[in-house]
Structure formats: C-alpha cells, structure tokens
Amino acid sequence: MLVRKAVGVLAGVLGLMLPLVAVAAPSASAEPQALVRTLYYDVSQAQEFVADWDRAATNWNNSVSNVKLARRTSTSGVNIRILADNGWPRAYVSSLGNGTVYMGRQAVQQGYHRPRISTHEIGHILGLPDRRTGLCADLMSGSSAPVSCRNELPNAAERAEVERRFAGSLAAVDVRAAGYTGGRTECFVY
C-alpha cells in the first residue's frame, strides 16, 4: 500500500514536470536580437528644405539598420535640430546621435545637390567625420566632390561605420570613443 501510494505521488510529480521538460530553452548560440536606436529630428525650422531632410532620413533608413531616423512627434524628444540660414551647411555634434544641422544656402546657390548636403550633415550626427577625398562616391567627401555630384547615399565603408557605432545596446555611447574630443560640441562644415 505504501509503495502504491509512493508510485502514485511520483507519477503525479512527473506528470506536472513533463510540460516543463517539453519547453526547450533557447540555445546559447541563438543570435541576440539587435536593438535599434531611433533618433528624432525636428524640421520645424528647416524652412524651404524640409523635403531634403526627410529625404536624408530615408537615405539613412534605407542604408543602415542599427539606427533609424524619424520625424519628431508630439510625444518624442528631439535628437537633431534642423535649421536653415544663408551660410555654409554645417553640423554641430554634441554627442553621438545628437546635435544641430544647418542647410546653408551658400552651397545651394553654388549648385551643390541639396539631398547630398542633408544626408552628409546627418552623417556627422551619426558619427562620421569629413573625409575630403574629392570622390563623388564618398558621401562624407562633402564639398570636395565636384558640384555636379548627385550621389546622396553613403558608401559601404560609411554604412559599416554607422552600423558599428550604433551596434549593441541603447546605452549612452562614450563620445570620446565615437571620435569626439573632450565632450565639446564639434562643428563640421560641408
């Protein structure tokens, strides 16, 4: 009788544990899902260049996957302030993913391609420095490329660098490691 009762209890316990055994735990080799950081940009002061900044956001969104650009909403913060003036296009980067960019009419009046300018300036916010190669294929060559250049997309190396800078967690990035010095705001001119 005691044995029969013990077997019954054991069978009941095993019956309760069976569903737990059937559920497989994720394997250690499973790829962690990448975290995508969203940066919000504000075009309320972009004047006649709003469409160019939206196009720059689309260019970057179609080129990289670790960071996404979205227009500011009523509930979001602002990472990127966008302004327009009569000077030269430029970016003031306060930290990776944050800063202020200007569409300067001087470059537009000289004939530089507006979507290339806006995509280039956002590149600075995404951690890319100027690289004065003079090549149209290099987005970050900026105004060193010919005025006739219409390439508004980052090349493979530029895309890879942005992916690397935004890979991993959503935690704050050390701006010194991202290429900025002393926590100061850095200015890049097209």
Short names for language-model regions:
Residues 50-57, 115-119, 137, 159, ...:
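Extracytoplasmic/secreted envelope proteins and their assembly/folding machinery
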Residues 1-30:
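Secretory targeting and sorting signals
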Residues 32-45, 103, 142-145:
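Acidic/histidine-rich, surface-exposed loop or edge segments in extracytoplasmic proteins
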Residues 39-70:
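A short alpha-helix/helix-coil micro-patch that ends at or immediately precedes a cysteine
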Residues 2, 108, 113, 129-190:
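Metalloprotease/metallohydrolase-associated module, dominated by Zn2+-dependent proteases
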Residues 60, 116-130:
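Active-site recognition of the HExxH zinc-binding catalytic motif
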Residues 67-92, 98-102:
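Short, well-ordered secondary-structure micro-motifs within conserved domains or adaptor modules
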Residues 101-119:
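Short pre-active-site segment immediately N-terminal to the catalytic Zn-binding motif
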